Structures are given as structure tokens and as C-alpha cells.
Amino acid sequence: MALQRLRDQGGFSGDRIADCELSTVYASGSDWLQVVVEKTDLSQGNLAGARIRESTFAHTALRKARLRGARMERVELYFCDLNEVDASELSARRAKVHGSEAMNAVFTGAQLAVVRFEETKLYRARFDQSLLVRVVFLDSRLGGPSLEKADFSGARLVDVSLRAANLQAATFSGATLVGVDFTDAALEGADFRGAAAIGCRFPAGFSP
């Protein structure tokens, strides 16, 4: 049913998709408007260039899915598997990712504005060459977000909260950091070579 709708209409509008097996689905360039997706397998699916607006994904697998160049606005993802997702060059605005896993996820060259990552594991996630504006990373369960070995090299971060984040062995080499909050963050082994930091808050005694 969902596949037929996708083929006939090139996307979904106002639909609820639940308990569907859609792994490896080809949905490049598709349009998703006010869609609710629950307990659905979209792993390794191709959603490159898709336009996703005012939609919610819950308990859904997007492992190794391709979201390259996709556009998201007012999208919320709850308890989703985003491990190894390819979200390079993604454009996301007013989005929230909660209770999910996005380890080894790729956001290279992405533009994220007013985005929240809550209780989401981002170990080894890549944000290199990306633009992050008013992005919040938080995890009340762990005391701070999990971003060990994350890659922010060459990225531009503006008004970003990484308060109490675990950023051990993360790299910010060549990054531009404006108004970034690193208060109480764990920065052991983090690489700030060539980074420019303006108006940032770092842990006491730390100098990038």
C-alpha cells in the first residue's frame, strides 16, 4: 500500500505508515508532508533529495539510509535507528531527534538550523564542513551528550550548545566556533588545531 502510494503520487501527504517493511526502498526526490511513520523499516532506503515537512518518525529504522541533500522542516524523530545514515548535505530546520542512535552518522556539509539532538548517541558522527546554527545537543540520562570522536573539522558552529558533552578525541580542526557553549564538556584529546573560537564558553582551565 505504502509503496503503491509512493509510486503513484511521488510521496505521501497526511498519511500514517506503520509496521511496514520498506528497507532499501527507492524514494529519492519524494515529497513527505504531515506524515507519521511508526515501527517501519526504512534501513538502507534511498531518500536522497527528499523533501520532508511537518512529519514524525517513531521507532523507525533508518540505518544506512541515504538522506543526502534531503530537506527537512519541522520534522521529529523519536527512538529511531540512525546509525551510519548518510545525511551529507542535508538541510534541516526546526527539527528534533530524541532517544535515538546516530553513531557513525554522516552530516558532512549539512546545514542544520534550530535543531535539537536529545538523548541521542552520536559517537563518531561526522559534521565536517557543516553549518550548525542554534543547535542543541543534550542528554539528561548520561549527564551530557555522547559525541566521542565526533568530527566537526572545517565546520561552522553558531550559538551551539555542547554543554557537558562527551567530546573526548573529537576534532574541531579548522572549525569556526561562534558563541558555542562547551561548559563542563569532556574535551580530553579533542583537536582544536586551526580553529577560530569567538565568544565561546570552555571548561575552567581549558584553552583550545
Residue ranges and their predicted role:
Residues 7-208:
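Tandem repeat scaffolds
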